[in-house]
Structures are given as C-alpha cells and as structure tokens.
UniProtKB/Swiss-Prot annotation:
Pfam families: V-set
Chain residue ranges for the region called Complementarity-determining-2: 54-60
Residue ranges of the region described as Framework-1: 1-23
Cysteines paired by S-S bonds: 23-92
Transmembrane segments: none
Region named Framework-2: 39-53
Protein name: Ig kappa chain V-III region PC 7940
Species name: Mus musculus
Amino acid sequence: DIVLTQSPASLAVSLGQRATISCRASKSVSAFGYSYMHWYQQKPGQPPKLLIYLASNLESGVPARFSGSGSGTDFTLNIHPVEEEDAVTYYCQHSRELPPTFGGGTKLEIK
C-alpha cells in the first residue's frame, strides 16, 4: 500500500495568513500525465468534503483561497487567506492504486 505522510500534524495560523500543509507519498502517485492526489476537509461530525482533486483542481463550490500543487511524491495544500471557518482537519488521499489511502490528517487552528 502507498503510505501518505502529512505534516505538520497540527498548525496554528493567524487570520488572514497562509496555511501550508504537506503530504508525501511512499511512492509516486503520478501517471499518464495526472497526479492522483486529492485533498479533503473534515468538520466534526461530518464526512470529509473534497476540496482539491488531481493535485491542483478546485472542486466546484470550494473557495479560491484553497489551492493545491505538487507531483510525484510531494504535494502541498495552501489556504490563503485563512478564515475562521477553516479551523478544522485536512487530509490528503491518493487514488493511484488500490487500496486508496489517506494521510494522518492536519488540524488547523486559528491563533
């Protein structure tokens, strides 16, 4: 299985500043011109919500302050400017092969 390692596990950012979350895969999740890495946001008591698909594509309805980048094994989620409602947990997930796996999560806090 492909292991996804997220960092940091928790992050405190001031309102209006930038939050950067990293995800490293144990092997490449890129193939055929695509990077099969996705980012989710999970609020307490709710299922994960897709934010970014195929590394850098913004899901419909997601604010443009969210962006994704990366290829191969290293990926980044950026949130800028951070808003109060963004203080939840974020996960990366790959779909390069079965089974799809998730990173361990990053909890974003506002300071």
